[in-house]
Amino acid sequence: MANLRKTHPLLKIANDALVDLPAPSNISVWWNFGSLLGLCLATQILTGLFLAMHYTSDISTAFSSVCHICRDVSYGWLIRNIHANGASFFFICIYMHIARGLYYGSYLYKETWNIGVVLLLLTMMTAFVGYVLPWGQMSFWGATVITNLLSAVPYVGGALVQWIWGGFSVDNATLTRFFAFHFLFPFVIAAATVLHLLFLHETGSNNPAGINSDADKISFHPYFSYKDLLGFVAMLLGLTSLALFAPNLLGDPDNFTPANPLVTPPHIKPEWYFLFAYAILRSIPNKLGGVLALLFSILVLMVVPILHTSKQRGLTFRPLTQFLFWALVADMLILTWIGGMPVEHPFIIIGQIASVIYFTIFLVLSPLAGWAENKALQWA
């Protein structure tokens, strides 16, 4: 049997990725989030599949079908709560995974990093179209506001929006196609994840010290397989606790009201995990400018490897850039808070300042800090 896993064409691939994979001996708990994301994706696909068996993508029955799932389907309430809150845990893991990459310089594996950014965009797109499906007030108005942003595209904007809507407003055609996209995208994400892993295994994992670890590698199984298992238990405990004790904690009360095109909710806002990007979008008074800022708030991650100036890889021994990293974390929390607030004084100016700081840290201060630390090393 020991030989079969090393020789069988299919088992060999699994063996090289999950059993005999050489891994640095000093990788910390921050390296757990990759496998946790895999677990999140599997959970979402599985719960989503069971929800799709009972859901109807028609504006006259969508809201009722979700009610039916929660009331009449065996454990439907649990499946829906796990799916809805699983999305929140998915994004918590994504943001932690990206933060780890930024802190320890994992972005220097450029192919792996860029596929990761594409994965983030795909996941955000999937979550957005999924949020529209229950056809509540916030689903409908969220879809209207976000799809309307495409009208800012010069010359073809108007036609583009109507093409995506499948008509002159968000209607039945929109809901049907969003359901089709929401069903399809997770499998695209799974395929892109395979590519992400393929490129990662070309180089091997980075480690907290940021130095070559070829001299000190250990096998993935049993060491990190059990370490990942501990992460699985912790995350599933958190997810089930949230789904069972406070399933609506992170949702919007407006979504318990069926969609009504004639009544606009007082505050239109996305789910909590998009609030930071929504705050950046709202901080610019110009429509096209806001859309570009929204886009670049994510795409800025792609320029991080290009702007890396330091001679050291991670931030473990770089206090100046460490300060910038934690300033960025604080800034994102402020943006998340502002995204959920009404557009009025003082929230407008706070959002604008936080947005400027967000881009300044990425594009100006981090490269400068790396350069300054190199100079300090020369003087030492």
UniProtKB/Swiss-Prot annotation:
Its main location: mitochondrion. It is found in: Mitochondrion inner membrane. The keyword Iron applies. Pfam families: Cytochrom_B_C (PF00032), Cytochrome_B (PF00033). Heme b b562 binds at H83, H182. Keywords: Electron transport, Heme, Iron, Membrane, Metal-binding, Mitochondrion, Mitochondrion inner membrane, Respiratory chain, Transmembrane, Transmembrane helix, Transport, Ubiquinone. GO terms for molecular function: metal ion binding; ubiquinol-cytochrome-c reductase activity. PROSITE patterns: CYTB_CTER, CYTB_NTER. It comes from the Eukaryota. It is a multi-pass membrane protein. The chain crosses the membrane at residues 33-53, 77-98, 113-133, 178-198, 226-246, 288-308, 320-340, 347-367. Its cofactor is heme b. Binds 2 heme b groups non-covalently. Heme b b566 binds at H97, H196. A ubiquinone binds at H201. One of its GO terms (cellular component) is respiratory chain complex III. Heme 1 (or BL or b562) is low-potential and absorbs at about 562 nm, and heme 2 (or BH or b566) is high-potential and absorbs at about 566 nm. PANTHER family: CYTOCHROME B. Component of the ubiquinol-cytochrome c reductase complex (complex III or cytochrome b-c1 complex) that is part of the mitochondrial respiratory chain. The b-c1 complex mediates electron transfer from ubiquinol to cytochrome c. Contributes to the generation of a proton gradient across the mitochondrial membrane that is then used for ATP synthesis. This is Cytochrome b. It comes from Oncorhynchus keta.
